[in-house]
């Protein structure tokens, strides 16, 4: 009986795996951890035409980019953090680290709100932020469950 339950659950699990449709590249300033303060909203990718309208895409990206811009460190804080990095053995990076961390947290909240919008939720479209310390970059992933 247990084998019947596991075999029934397997197809349902396979169907609900999201498929990555598009990655929105970072175009703004990048912090040490790879987080960028802006993602490319200049063009609407043709891969997304079957899943969402350009207006929905633009509004979602504006929301995400605005969250990053609002909390991103100011130029003096940013400059001091990087400029004094060698002299302070990296300790100056903590000046802006709190702001970057808060920007990332706020952006995660905004992405959760974007995912709850009817235009995305009803179509099983999800947005998520991914970053790579190794590659020193980040991107937004748009996935869909078909």
Features from the language model and the residues they span:
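A composition-biased, non-transmembrane "mature-region" signal
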Residues: 1-146
